[in-house]
């Protein structure tokens, strides 16, 4: 986190002095941004505001929203942002040069593999991965992916998980994102197993009802500590969706609130808690999955929310998380017909809104490409290429990992994807890994 803020704070100096190359400028444009120096971990409230949109729970189609947060103040016992020294332009150029030098030393194949965030089963071919040994070592040498995502079946107990993740990381030439879905509530891969030693927090909607930013900050901070102790460095959380449809079961209580301002405050606090603990956070599922009734795990899901509605509601929590410095955003598979005819994670228009309208310059990742909204219409190679052409940086869990890699490499060789486009995404990936201390680049 310190490195990310240092690099960002010196952008203007670097540009003015002309010390970076075009590649360096691309790097800086990719950095996640944090606008607040203090953790917003408490919230004062006004009288309840009656919302016109439905509440998030199907059994209560018309409910008033919780008190909206206004002018949050940091309590005295909340950890304050440590003072950071300013890097000189020369030091900043050194950060840039290290990343660019590392990128220059990678082969095309190595760079393409970095774009994939898969499961240990997909990587190795085993049925259920609960350990990492020679098979994992050989698989990572052949297919050096950018990240691995673990599920409850992989996590037997704390000691087993810690050993598995330590071994896995030791086999990687370029250090891996080691990720898990730990939202709380019904999506708690580690917390749902008492043997893991990870706190099983309540669903996001419970915290949204209380609208206590300090409490949510502590949830993020605790998860960062507990997951980090196991070897994880990325949490696919928080959910930044605003549930505006009471019949939405895919998101439901995974959302903090049907009030975008409350949801935004909670998302900001969760991102802050996670990332101050050096855990990469991932906002999901842009451009917002709270208005739908159908499940993209099963097939196509369509939203008819207008751009104005999205800007005034669904995008408020995403903007709050981005402003707090979230390093990654996940795109959903839903098709918003007012934005694009394509699933969101294959849509240049959706990526453009995220980059330009919301100012996000970190890693954009797809939702799982094993879900019906993708597999019913695209093969693995086609979906991966379309996502990268749209401007996405990482492909999550392609149905056929090798076919996805082959499709991307063939597209580069054919000129429908350029190596410069690949480099752009890999630079973002390396930058986040470097900034969070996952990738160590010494002089």
Task: Enumerate the predicted regions with their spans.
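Preference for extracellular/luminal or secreted protein segments
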Residues: 2-54, 60-62, 67, 71-76, ...
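Second-shell residues forming the walls of enzyme active-site clefts
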Residues: 107, 125-128, 132, 157-172, ...
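Extracytoplasmic
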Residues: 111-115, 143, 163, 171-173, ...
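Short acidic, glycine-rich surface-loop motifs adjacent to enzyme active sites
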Residues: 113, 136-157, 236, 246, ...
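A substrate-binding/cap region within the structured catalytic cores of diverse enzymes
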Residues: 202-271, 275
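Flexible hinge/switch segments at interdomain interfaces of large molecular machines
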Residues: 239-245, 286-290, 443
């Amino acid at each position: 986190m310190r490195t990310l803020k240092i690099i960002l704070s010196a952008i203007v100096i670097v540009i003015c002095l002309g010390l970076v190359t075009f590649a360096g400028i691309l790097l800086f444009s990719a950095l996640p941004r944090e606008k607040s120096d203090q953790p917003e971990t408490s919230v004062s409230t006004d009288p309840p505001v009656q919302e016109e949109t439905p509440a998030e729970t199907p059994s209560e189609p018309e409910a008033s929203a919780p008190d909206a947060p206004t002018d949050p103040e940091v309590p005295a016992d909340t950890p304050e942002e440590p003072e950071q020294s300013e890097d000189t332009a020369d030091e900043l150029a050194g950060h840039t040069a290290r990343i660019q030098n590392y990128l220059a030393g990678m082969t095309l194949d190595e760079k393409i593999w970095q774009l994939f965030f898969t499961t240990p089963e997909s990587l190795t071919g085993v049925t259920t991965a609960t350990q990492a040994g020679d098979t994992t070592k050989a698989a990572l040498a052949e297919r050096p992916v950018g990240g691995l995502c673990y599920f409850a079946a992989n996590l037997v107990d704390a000691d087993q998980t810690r050993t598995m993740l330590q071994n896995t990381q030791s086999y990687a030439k370029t250090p891996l994102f080691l990720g898990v879905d730990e939202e709380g509530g019904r999506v708690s891969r580690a917390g749902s197993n008492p043997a893991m030693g990870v706190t099983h927090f309540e669903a996001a909607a419970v915290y949204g009802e209380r609208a206590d930013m300090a409490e949510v900050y502590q949830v993020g901070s605790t998860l960062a500590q507990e997951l980090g102790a196991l070897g994880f460095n990325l949490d696919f959380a928080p959910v930044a969706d605003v549930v505006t449809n009471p019949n939405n079961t895919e998101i439901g209580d995974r959302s903090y609130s049907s009030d975008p301002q409350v949801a935004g405050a909670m998302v900001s606090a969760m991102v802050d808690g996670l990332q101050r603990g050096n855990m990469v956070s991932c906002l999901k599922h842009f451009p917002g999955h709270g208005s739908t009734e159908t499940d993209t795990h099963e097939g196509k899901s369509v939203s008819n929310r207008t751009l104005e509605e999205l800007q005034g509601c669904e995008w408020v929590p995403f903007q709050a998380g981005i402003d707090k410095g979230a390093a990654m955003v996940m795109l959903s598979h839903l098709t918003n017909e007012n934005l694009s005819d394509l699933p969101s994670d294959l849509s240049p228009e959706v990526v453009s809104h995220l980059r330009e309208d919301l100012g996000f310059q970190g890693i954009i990742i797809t939702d799982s490409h094993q879900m019906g909204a993708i597999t019913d219409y695209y093969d693995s190679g086609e979906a991966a290429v379309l996502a990268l052409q749209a401007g996405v940086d990482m492909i999550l869990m392609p149905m056929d990992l090798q076919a996805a890699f082959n499709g991307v490499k063939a597209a580069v060789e054919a000129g429908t994807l350029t190596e410069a486009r690949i480099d752009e995404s890999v630079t973002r990936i390396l930058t986040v890994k470097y900034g969070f201390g996952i990738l160590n680049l010494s002089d």
